[in-house]
Structure formats: structure tokens, C-alpha cells
């Protein structure tokens, strides 16, 4: 059942309410082929083969069917990897069951037992080398986890999970939040209304780079864009500008950041909107633009 259904589900997605047949030809002609197929290499190799086989079979049996290839573009992402651990009896141990003591990896429940450390492999339930996402989110937040996975390497390469990496990403999210607070503080100050368009020029470049890297799956470069943006904005907010210039461009930057750090971006946008309600001269500046 899984083998059969997973080989043509994309056709059903085109006609979810079709009651008499698996799909509607008009819907298929409109939606197919799938624009972008994304999957791990082990899954994609077999599933891609089966799906193409099913599509050819349907095309052969149905002369009105005009789609021979189900997917227009293929992207195989890397896997998230972690070290593997075993006890003396070759039983797999999870990362939560081990700890480092005096440079040695031992079992938490029995520090006298040395743990055999294996190679870093794709996270797998059977090998217990997985990380509980709920613990990561609870300790560091979902955005920090997203940042680390995106920043470590190009998306087609494997990611080596490490505690140091997630901590580094967590600290960067904190730096972004501190920057947000400084920008809010600047909005409450009286600035000379100089026509400083450096922020506007940089924002346009930032949006262009973000869009390009998103379209090309260059997610690790997106994180580099965020670091560059942080450095620029941290210096730029000390310069003279009109409040409306800062507000409008900072909003654009936050919106562009949403696919990368959605929780942070939306929180900042909400706070910024509240701030605008109490910034009366911002409206006055807008009316004069």
C-alpha cells in the first residue's frame, strides 16, 4: 500500500475532492509537473524511480494523459549526523545516556563503564544517535536550531550536530534581539532629519541577496547575510536618519528574515507595530515624504 500510494500521491494532491477517479485531468494539466522535488538521497533514489515508473505506466494506459515526467527539478539535501555510542555488550546508547568525564566518554548511570564512540552517521532511531527536538527547543528555541542547521554547511552536504554549534546559534539570536532593542531605543530619541539613505541602499542589497540565496538553496549563505546585516545595522543606528527611514527599512529586513528565524522576526514585527502606535512623529514624517 505504501509503495503504491507514495508513487502517485502528487496526482491526488491536484484533485483532493475528486470522487469518481483518482485525479482530474484538467487539474493535472494545470498543476503538474511538480516544480521542485526535495528529499534525502537514500529516499529520493528509490522513490524517484518508482514515481517515474508509475507516471509512464499511467501515460501508457491513458492516451489523454500528457505528463511523462512527474518532477521538474530535483534537490537532494544532506542528512543531520551525530556520533554513535555503544556499551561493552555492543548495545546502542543515546547521547542522553553518556557524558564526558576527565576526557573519557562514560555512561551516566555507571561512570565506571567506558563508552565506545563510533563514527558520525545519519541520525537513526535504531542507532539511538538522535537528538530530542523538544529538548533543543526548550533550551535554545526553535530559531536557534534552524540557524544552526542552515549555517553549518551547504544544504546538499551533511550537517554534523554539535552542542557547541547550537549554543553559538543561540547566542547569535540573542545578539539579534539586543540589536532589536537598540533600534527601538533609537526610535524614542530625537534625531536630526538628515537625508541619510545608507540604510535604504543596504536594505535593497540585503533583500536581493536573501532572495537570490533562497531561490538557489544557498541556505548557509543566508546566515552569512544575517551576520552581515547585524554588523551593518549595529553601526548604522548610531548615524543620523529620519525615523520613518529606519522603521520602513527595518520592517523590510524583518520580513525577509522570516523564512530563517520566523519566531524571532514575527515577535520583533509585533513589538515594532506597538511601538509605532506611540511614535506620533513617525506618522508626521510619513505624511511629508
Regions found by a protein language model. Give the residues of each.
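N-terminal accessory segments
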Residues: 192-195
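Amphipathic alpha-helical
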Residues: 257-276
